[in-house]
């Protein structure tokens, strides 16, 4: 019995070690969280998007995200992480909490945080020493500019209900694209430790 227990402990330690993959596998749970976040965003709808047509804006969702074939595996993970982090930051603001149903907003922020926590498990192992260089990586800079455009738009519109509705619809689009990127990463091997 002691031998079996020792063997199991060794397997767990190896799985979570630098060469293991248990901690960095893009799990089904991550995909389920992503789908749930999209459902929550859909439920947050307070206005008819048609009533806000005059406030529409093309935020220029980065083509690197839309056409993810352009991203290599080593770029896809940081772009996905940045997209989720920026989404969380957008909805975890004072202005956001004034615009949305508090319960739904808290559930959305919790769901985004769960996705980030899962990816954080992998982040150090996947990016390691390169982390400091990622801030300068073109796709990451593009994602940051995209979100800065959303922040600028909200400020320009005075954080109006219609502006938030337009942003909600845009974020559904962005999170749908990030879900597609997650699927693509999974098809690339799912184990983010593999070369």
Curated annotation (Swiss-Prot):
Keywords: Antiviral defense, Cytokine, Disulfide bond, Hormone, Pregnancy, Secreted, Signal. Constitutively and exclusively expressed in the mononuclear cells of the extraembryonic trophectoderm. Disulfide bonds join 24-122, 52-162. GO terms for cellular component: extracellular space. SMART domains: IFabd. Its main location: secreted. It is found in: Secreted. GO terms for molecular function: cytokine activity; cytokine receptor binding; hormone activity. Coiled coil: none annotated. Residues 1-23 form the signal peptide. InterPro entries: 4_helix_cytokine-like_core (IPR009079), Interferon_alpha/beta/delta (IPR000471). One of its GO terms (biological process) is female pregnancy. Belongs to the alpha/beta interferon family. IFN-alphaII subfamily. Paracrine hormone primarily responsible for maternal recognition of pregnancy. Interacts with endometrial receptors, probably type I interferon receptors, and blocks estrogen receptor expression, preventing the estrogen-induced increase in oxytocin receptor expression in the endometrium. This results in the suppression of the pulsatile endometrial release of the luteolytic hormone prostaglandin F2-alpha, hindering the regression of the corpus luteum (luteolysis) and therefore a return to ovarian cyclicity. IFN-tau genes are intronless. They evolved from IFN-omega genes in the ruminantia suborder and have continued to duplicate independently in different lineages of the ruminantia. They code for proteins very similar in sequence but with different biological potency and pattern of expression. This is Interferon tau-1.
């Amino acid at each position: 019995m002691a031998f079996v227990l020792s063997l199991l402990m060794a397997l767990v330690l190896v799985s979570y070690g630098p060469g293991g993959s248990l901690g960095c596998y893009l799990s089904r749970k991550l995909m389920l969280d992503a789908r749930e976040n999209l459902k929550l965003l859909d439920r947050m709808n307070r206005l008819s998007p048609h009533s806000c047509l005059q406030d529409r804006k093309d935020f220029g969702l980065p083509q690197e995200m839309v056409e993810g074939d352009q991203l290599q595996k080593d770029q896809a993970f940081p772009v996905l992480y940045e997209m989720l982090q920026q989404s969380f930051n957008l909805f975890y603001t004072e202005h956001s909490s004034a615009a949305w149903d508090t319960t739904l907003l808290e559930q959305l922020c919790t769901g985004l945080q769960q996705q980030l926590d899962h990816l954080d498990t992998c982040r150090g192992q996947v990016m390691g020493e390169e982390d400091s260089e990622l801030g300068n990586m073109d796709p990451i800079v593009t994602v940051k500019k995209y979100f800065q455009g959303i922040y600028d738009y909200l400020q320009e519109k005075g954080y109006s209900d219609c502006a938030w509705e337009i942003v909600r619809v845009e974020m559904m689009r962005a999170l749908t694209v990030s879900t597609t990127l997650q699927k693509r990463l999974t098809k690339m091997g799912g184990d983010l430790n593999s070369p």
